[in-house]
Amino acid sequence: MSGQPPPPPPQQQQQQQQLSPPPPAALAPVSGVVLPAPPAVSAGSSPAGSPGGGAGGEGLGAAAAALLLHPPPPPPPATAAPPPPPPPPPPPASAAAPASGPPAPPGLAAGPGPAGGAPTPALVAGSSAAAPFPHGDSALNEQEKELQRRLKRLYPAVDEQETPLPRSWSPKDKFSYIGLSQNNLRVHYKGHGKTPKDAASVRATHPIPAACGIYYFEVKIVSKGRDGYMGIGLSAQGVNMNRLPGWDKHSYGYHGDDGHSFCSSGTGQPYGPTFTTGDVIGCCVNLINNTCFYTKNGHSLGIAFTDLPPNLYPTVGLQTPGEVVDANFGQHPFVFDIEDYMREWRTKIQAQIDRFPIGDREGEWQTMIQKMVSSYLVHHGYCATAEAFARSTDQTVLEELASIKNRQRIQKLVLAGRMGEAIETTQQLYPSLLERNPNLLFTLKVRQFIEMVNGTDSEVRCLGGRSPKSQDSYPVSPRPFSSPSMSPSHGMNIHNLASGKGSTAHFSGFESCSNGVISNKAHQSYCHSNKHQSSNLNVPELNSINMSRSQQVNNFTSNDVDMETDHYSNGVGETSSNGFLNGSSKHDHEMEDCDTEMEVDSSQLRRQLCGGSQAAIERMIHFGRELQAMSEQLRRDCGKNTANKKMLKDAFSLLAYSDPWNSPVGNQLDPIQREPVCSALNSAILETHNLPKQPPLALAMGQATQCLGLMARSGIGSCAFATVEDYLH
């Protein structure tokens, strides 16, 4: 019966759900980074990872953060706290809820309900508008996580921010005879079912992304109902939902009552067996060759449709009472082994790539590849390897060896968290670089503030005396726009940066691979001496953050900046005999001995704000005030910069938590976050030598990645099985 539909009736109005009114617009943030005055917080009142007095746990309301802009006022005289108000009297018995109604959840009061029913919960003044059960359904959360993992494994090339995957049926894109339940995964028929005009369908929430390459979903027949007139398939947006899938143009379906396939026509073609209650029907869309096949109970039924158009939605249709089906878009393992089918097509695509012809006229291709490799080694400062590779391939190194070593010195300082020394060394070797790039300088100094919080910057590591490659004395009052990490002779006034107005620090998706990926176990050296550092800083609000004992550190000598102890390609100290970059020296072993002595204490010092020193905290607060002033001056001279504003706000937010490392913004303290800063500085130095800020090899990788994204947007499904990472061995 479903194979002989009537002529398409006029489009009937589909059932639409009324959208709730939009929430009130959020308050626009004020210009600049403004920290509110801190409330009174007793020592030790904030648990680890909780805000140190900041409202809501995410802002900058902590007392420590406020000190960046407001010096601590003298403590007010102690006064006795007023007694708490007496509790309100219990309500009279007549105001109690009816005994027949369920009690309202905490935070809700019983309000007037429907006639004859129990009262409905109403929000009490001051209570949250969230769900009455604050913890939510943990089982549902776990199911959502499992769905996310399964979809990521099946469709790794899909960017769901750009092209979301279908996850359920759409309550807004269905005919009125369709009912949805169980998180919009179960479909049941609620019409009359007397004629084919009573057919009804529903589409999924999103179309199938081309980046899937191969997409698959399954439908289980819970009940075939009266006649089993059910259709499973695909349809484009706008296709009439008062029809079974397959009856109209750009609609495709496999029907259960007769086993026929319907390809944009009311006349079906014999295709497969019928299906009924208990059967599981799968639909696989191959976006590489634009075909579709079905499965029944895990067995393929062969190709059903060819030459499919792009942007099709999973669709299911019902026609008679009692019909109920459940969809599986990846919420559960599939009956059919779709992953084996995907592996088969991945092999085919990779074989096509391997067979692609490459013209090699007199070794031009090989020579080009060698130049790309050589420039990559030079860009990242692999001196000895670059020299050896150039000799073996009869090439010349474009950059002088001394220049490569200078860049390497600076990169090592940045990757070690010694930002103050990195800024100082950069200014000594490239005097005008940071003047022409004020936003880059700001980025470096924000990173220096983060390293101060982390206790790794030289300003807080060396408290026994003069900082290496740093200023002779730390300013007591804020000196606008001069770097606390630089000697006075190298101080930089922001007005001298006006010539670089509009310049920005250069970031790209490939700059983060400056020296590979840094592991979380980044090597950090600490030395100690017998000199005890103390401070008379009176900041009672920080008592819950700091440990009672002071950090004991030693002065680093000036040759620290020239050390070659660590190869930071992975953030872990490595030694080898590969020339200048990867070499070791006597100083290496001295630093290793120092680390051995501090093995027990260093782990504790790293978990304290500024290494646990009050003097270091005082320096950090002064530095933060100067950083805030520099941000305001940059905004006046160069205009608003949203990235700079967010960067500074995130850095200051670290002080709103008693344990910044385990806070929502604690990822900033991860050594891997030094990589993009290091890459931006390295690229800026290369530009001063008229060298490309990115190596050609990275640009080629970027172009290939962008091409794959363009293929996905153009509906070419083979991009799903041609990732750049497959060829990076």
From Swiss-Prot:
May act as scaffolding protein, and as adapter protein to couple membrane receptors to intracellular signaling pathways. Acts as a mediator of cell spreading and actin cytoskeleton rearrangement. Core component of the CTLH E3 ubiquitin-protein ligase complex that selectively accepts ubiquitin from UBE2H and mediates ubiquitination and subsequent proteasomal degradation of the transcription factor HBP1. May be involved in signaling of ITGB2/LFA-1 and other integrins. Enhances HGF-MET signaling by recruiting Sos and activating the Ras pathway. This is Ran-binding protein 9. Keywords: Acetylation, Cell membrane, Cytoplasm, Membrane, Nucleus, Phosphoprotein, Ubl conjugation. The SPRY domain mediates the interaction with MET, AR, and CDC2L1. It is found in: Cytoplasm; Nucleus; Cell membrane. Part of a complex consisting of RANBP9, MKLN1 and GID8. Identified in the CTLH complex that contains GID4, RANBP9 and/or RANBP10, MKLN1, MAEA, RMND5A (or alternatively its paralog RMND5B), GID8, ARMC8, WDR26 and YPEL5. Within this complex, MAEA, RMND5A (or alternatively its paralog RMND5B), GID8, WDR26, and RANBP9 and/or RANBP10 form the catalytic core, while GID4, MKLN1, ARMC8 and YPEL5 have ancillary roles. Interacts with GTP-bound Ran, AR, CDC2L1/p110C, CALB1, S100A7, USP11, MKLN1, SOS1 or SOS2, GID8, and FMR1. Interacts with the Dyrk kinases HIPK2, DYRK1A, and DYRK1B. Ubiquitously expressed, with highest levels in testes, placenta, heart, and muscle, and lowest levels in lung. Within the brain, expressed predominantly by neurons in the gray matter of cortex, the granular layer of cerebellum and the Purkinje cells. Residues 1-11, 70-93 have a biased composition (Pro residues). Residues 365-397 form the LisH domain. It comes from Homo sapiens (Human). Residues 147-334 form the B30.2/SPRY domain. One of its GO terms (molecular function) is enzyme binding. Residues 27-49, 107-126, 473-489 have a biased composition (Low complexity). Coiled coil: none annotated. It comes from the Eukaryota. It is a peripheral membrane protein. Residues 50-60 have a biased composition (Gly residues). Residues 401-407 are annotated as: Interaction with CALB1.
